[in-house]
């Protein structure tokens, strides 16, 4: 913990979010690879607080399970009845044992654009000004629906926050709004919450009333104005969800470009907050970078690629393809129109070419699967070439089975490898073969019916047809040349 690290961060995530018109709790809707509350928790963790608690209510089990499945455990408190933000914070403090020594930051769980940097500035301002409470505020073009920051005309000090429904016409003209994010002196917060009343239009305990209570008790109330008002955007409907996704995507792409990644067309590129990259990676238009994807130095992806939970090696190329939970080695080539499913590991300078699908397959260094093939549940050695239109037949109707092909093999076009089967090193297979038995190293495997030509069949069985006429003309031409 640093000198300005808060003692506790309380995240409010108990509301239902009826305006989302969804069976999914509002805070679990996702943008840029994380849920709304997941983004808030990630920002809060940047402050390295001693305690982090999320107050849950609506769909308690679902939200708690989501939080438990995250990168690190999150403590939760339960607000059984939705009695307002003040009541929610009381539930959070009770989970922490009551009064907290030090700074307590309260943040809403539906503000995914809020950055750790802004939260850090709030904590620093709170400590430097020795405030009892510091509100994170913002100047916005349209303050409709937000609580207004009311200041003393003479001193500029914050006197109260008035909710939109309770504001006068004069107060509704104020453009400085409450973000719903606060820093409190933990020693004073608990007592002040106990004095909050419910005589307002909603009949709820407003957390904002704590400001007036503390100010009237002679304590200092301050504000920290956010540098970018868009950070405090709260999500209440699908329109705001889409806007937040757009803004966050722009921020993430800007960060990537400043780190040395070339993004050819940011407007058509999507990136998740969990994606990592190295300098001189190139992202072409229409590309989605999702999940825990990593782009190594000099890698190149797109156009029109979906790269999800995939490690793309240095200098590798992915063109017009989909990769899911795959590993692509340095200098490897994927696509166009390839599909790498989970468990695919493509070796250094290997190739999964046009219309190739792979699943749970390990492909060795320099090995190529160039065209029109399915490789499932397989291990292929180094510097092997798989012929076009090959199928690794891995399913017998009950269970999946594995195929192993060695190094420096050359398999013919239109082969089928019926698992379980092992093909040794240096093997050649003939085109059209169905390989059902193991092939020893250095062998040529031929597994197809012998060709039989029945001469004159077309003339006898299809007399007068175009084929028969063409055959007759060809025969006459041949006879004339002899």
From Swiss-Prot:
Mg(2+) binds at residues 110, 236. GO terms for molecular function: glucosamine-1-phosphate N-acetyltransferase activity; magnesium ion binding; UDP-N-acetylglucosamine diphosphorylase activity. Residues 458-482 are annotated as: Disordered. Residues 260-482 are annotated as: N-acetyltransferase. Pfam families: Hexapep, NTP_transf_3. It is found in: Cytoplasm. Keywords: Acyltransferase, Cell shape, Cell wall biogenesis/degradation, Cytoplasm, Magnesium, Metal-binding, Multifunctional enzyme, Nucleotidyltransferase, Peptidoglycan synthesis, Repeat, Transferase. InterPro entries: Bifunctional_GlmU, GlmU-like, GlmU_C_LbH, Hexapep, MobA-like_NTP_Trfase, Nucleotide-diphossugar_trans, Trimer_LpxA-like_sf. Residues 465-476 have a biased composition (Low complexity). Residues 1-238 are annotated as: Pyrophosphorylase. Pathway: Nucleotide-sugar biosynthesis; UDP-N-acetyl-alpha-D-glucosamine biosynthesis; N-acetyl-alpha-D-glucosamine 1-phosphate from alpha-D-glucosamine 6-phosphate (route II): step 2/2; Nucleotide-sugar biosynthesis; UDP-N-acetyl-alpha-D-glucosamine biosynthesis; UDP-N-acetyl-alpha-D-glucosamine from N-acetyl-alpha-D-glucosamine 1-phosphate: step 1/1; Bacterial outer membrane biogenesis; LPS lipid A biosynthesis. Residues 239-259 are annotated as: Linker. UDP-N-acetyl-alpha-D-glucosamine binds at residues 12-15, 26, 79, 84-85, 147, 163, 178, 236, 341, 359, 374, 385. Catalyzes the last two sequential reactions in the de novo biosynthetic pathway for UDP-N-acetylglucosamine (UDP-GlcNAc). The C-terminal domain catalyzes the transfer of acetyl group from acetyl coenzyme A to glucosamine-1-phosphate (GlcN-1-P) to produce N-acetylglucosamine-1-phosphate (GlcNAc-1-P), which is converted into UDP-GlcNAc by the transfer of uridine 5-monophosphate (from uridine 5-triphosphate), a reaction catalyzed by the N-terminal domain. Homotrimer. This is Bifunctional protein GlmU.
């Amino acid at each position: 913990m640093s000198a300005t690290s808060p003692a506790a961060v309380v995240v409010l995530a108990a509301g239902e979010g009826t305006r989302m018109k969804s069976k999914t709790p509002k805070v679990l809707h996702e943008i840029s690879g994380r849920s709304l509350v997941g983004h808030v928790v990630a920002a809060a963790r940047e402050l390295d607080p001693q305690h982090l608690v999320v107050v849950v209510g609506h769909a308690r089990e679902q939200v708690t399970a989501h939080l438990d499945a995250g990168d690190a455990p999150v403590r939760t408190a339960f607000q059984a009845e939705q009695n307002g933000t003040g009541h929610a914070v009381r539930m959070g403090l009770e989970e922490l044992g009551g009064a907290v020594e030090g700074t307590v930051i309260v943040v809403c769980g539906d503000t995914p654009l809020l950055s750790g940097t802004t939260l850090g500035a709030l904590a620093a301002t709170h400590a430097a000004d020795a405030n009892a409470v510091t509100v994170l505020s913002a100047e916005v073009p349209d303050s409709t629906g937000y609580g207004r920051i009311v200041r003393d005309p003479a001193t500029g000090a914050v006197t109260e926050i008035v909710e939109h429904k309770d504001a006068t016409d004069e107060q509704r003209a104020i453009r400085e709004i409450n973000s719903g994010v606060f820093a409190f002196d933990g020693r004073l917060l608990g007592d002040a919450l106990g004095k909050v009343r419910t005589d307002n239009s909603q009949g709820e305990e407003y957390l904002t009333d704590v400001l007036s209570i503390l100010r009237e008790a002679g304590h200092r109330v301050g504000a920290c104005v956010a540098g970018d008002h868009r950070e405090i955007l709260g999500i209440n409907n699908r329109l705001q969800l889409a806007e937040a996704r757009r803004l966050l995507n722009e921020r993430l792409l800007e960060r990537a470009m400043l780190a040395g990644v070339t993004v050819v067309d940011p407007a058509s590129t999507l990136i998740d907050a969990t994606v990592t990259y190295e300098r001189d990676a190139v992202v072409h238009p229409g590309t989605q970078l999702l999940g825990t994807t990593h782009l190594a130095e000099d890698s190149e992806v797109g156009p029109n690629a979906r790269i999800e939970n995939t490690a793309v090696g240095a200098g590798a190329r992915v063109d017009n393809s989909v990769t899911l939970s795959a590993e692509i080695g340095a200098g490897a080539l994927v696509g166009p129109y390839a599909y790498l499913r989970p468990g695919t590991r493509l070796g250094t300078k290997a190739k999964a070419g046009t219309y190739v699908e792979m699943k749970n397959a390990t492909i060795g260094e320099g090995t190529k699967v160039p065209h029109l093939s399915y490789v499932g549940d397989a291990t292929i050695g180094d510097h092997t070439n798989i012929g076009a239109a090959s199928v690794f037949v891995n399913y017998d109707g009950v269970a999946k089975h594995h195929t192993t092909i060695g190094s420096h093999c050359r398999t013919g076009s239109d082969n089928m490898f019926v698992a379980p089967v092992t093909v040794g090193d240096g093997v050649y297979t003939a085109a059209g073969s169905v390989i059902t038995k193991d092939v020893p190293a250095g062998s040529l495997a031929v597994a197809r019916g012998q060709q039989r030509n029945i001469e004159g069949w077309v003339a006898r069985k299809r007399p007068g047809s175009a084929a028969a006429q063409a055959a007759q003309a060809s025969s006459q031409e041949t006879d004339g040349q002899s």
